[in-house]
Swiss-Prot record:
GO terms for biological process: hydrogen peroxide catabolic process. It comes from Turdus merula. One of its GO terms (molecular function) is oxygen binding. It holds the Pfam family Globin. This is Hemoglobin subunit alpha-A. It comes from the Eukaryota.
Length: 141
């Protein structure tokens, strides 16, 4: 559960990430595919090479979902309801992959903004990303 301080940290971090969110989304996917090659199985039709237009386009979608969730941090489930339905009914992505994606996102943020990721902000973003993963897999039953 995100505390009031966590919510403030998440909103503040995403306001600073701002214009780079799409870039970070693509870099996060590239990092995940390189670090956890098993995640590539969900994208058999993609060119997964560095700088791929398909990875950039999907990274933009990932970033948009994270920004939407951050902007609606009091109602992440409501903000991501349609995406949750998609993952539950069609995509069936193994839930562990959301944790892997979250870890890669944190590394990407830390790489570009080392001073932003204080221990408190890191913990808040980690809790937020876990909450996003929980929402995206909540309807898997």
């Amino acid at each position: 559960v995100l505390s009031a301080a966590d919510k403030t940290n998440v909103k503040s971090a995403f306001s600073k990430i701002g214009g780079q969110a799409d870039e970070y989304g693509a870099e996060t996917l590239e990092r995940m595919f390189a670090t956890y090659p098993q995640t590539k199985t969900y994208f058999p039709h993609f060119d997964l090479g560095k700088g791929s237009a398909q990875v950039k386009a999907h990274g933009k979608k990932v970033a948009a979902a994270l920004v939407e969730a951050a902007n609606a941090v009091d109602d992440i489930a409501g903000a991501l309801s349609k995406l949750s339905d998609l993952h539950a009914q069609k995509l069936r992505v193994d839930p562990v992959n959301f944790k892997l994606l979250g870890q890669c996102f944190l590394v990407t943020v830390a790489t570009h903004n080392p001073s932003l990721l204080t221990p408190e902000v890191h913990a808040s973003l980690d809790k937020f990303l876990c909450a996003v993963g929980t929402v995206l897999t909540a309807k898997y039953r």
